[in-house]
């Protein structure tokens, strides 16, 4: 069995996972209840709940408390072709109805983080992991 003590700092878990539903409206979204101030975030999945089978571009990225930020995009076109590329948003989703949602981390906060929506064209669920 692996030693899992590295996952805790001072007896408290140093990673936390969750998901957040983002509305189609502009603005910032504060996510709280993490239990610590994160120093990094990883978006591990996106889901367009209004059009669940039509995502053609999905990007999940990461950001640390410094300047490192990147996402990897997977494009799935209607002809079945799949392409990959990279971008600079923390998250990015584009569907077949031409709706786009993208955004970045605004701040790491005492009990979570705040996302800022660059474009908010659809309701989007994002799945994330944060750590310290």
Regions inferred by a protein language model and the residue ranges of each:
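Enriched but not universal
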Residues: 1-19, 23, 129-132
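Surface-exposed ligand/attachment interfaces on beta-rich extracellular proteins
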Residues: 14-36, 46-64, 118-120
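Short, hydrophobic/aromatic-rich segments at coil-to-beta transitions
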Residues: 15-17, 110-113
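Short, solvent-exposed coil/turn segments at beta-strand boundaries
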Residues: 35-39, 65-66, 107-112
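Short, structured motif recognition centered on aromatic/hydrophobic residues
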Residues: 37-43, 130
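Contiguous ligand/interfacial binding patches
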Residues: 65-108
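Short, structured beta-strand segments at or near domain termini in extracellular proteins/domains
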Residues: 112-132
